[in-house]
């Protein structure tokens, strides 16, 4: 069983670039097309660790889906980000949906 450091709905930061993101899904290991030789995913250790689907914002504030290795991410301590309120709203919405009971027929 592989344990992940980050959860769905959690805000994270990219270690190298520093951008804020929200985890929307987790893969237990790299699960896209075979990586090119120069890609991060070509590293066996990274490829076999958890990978995260993360939503970030581009320079115009539009959402962008990224796929990042666990080693590329770090925890985000702040709860509010006035410069990127849509990511705060996305994280809160996901967490709420995960906690809300679902009615079934």
Swiss-Prot record:
SMART domains: YccV-like. This is Heat shock protein HspQ. Involved in the degradation of certain denaturated proteins, including DnaA, during heat shock stress. Keywords: Cytoplasm, Stress response. It holds the Pfam family YccV-like. It is found in: Cytoplasm. GO terms for molecular function: DNA binding. It comes from Yersinia enterocolitica serotype O:8 / biotype 1B (strain NCTC 13174 / 8081).
């Amino acid at each position: 069983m592989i344990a992940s450091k980050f959860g769905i709905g959690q805000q994270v930061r990219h270690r190298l670039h520093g951008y804020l993101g929200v985890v929307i899904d987790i893969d237990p290991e790299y699960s896209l097309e075979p990586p090119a030789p120069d890609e991060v995913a070509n590293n066996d250790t990274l490829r076999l660790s958890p990978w995260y689907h993360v939503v970030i914002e581009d320079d115009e504030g539009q959402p962008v889906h990224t796929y990042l290795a666990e080693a590329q991410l770090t925890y985000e301590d702040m709860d509010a980000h006035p410069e990127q309120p849509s990511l705060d709203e996305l994280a809160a919405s996901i967490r709420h949906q995960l906690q809300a009971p679902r009615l079934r027929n």
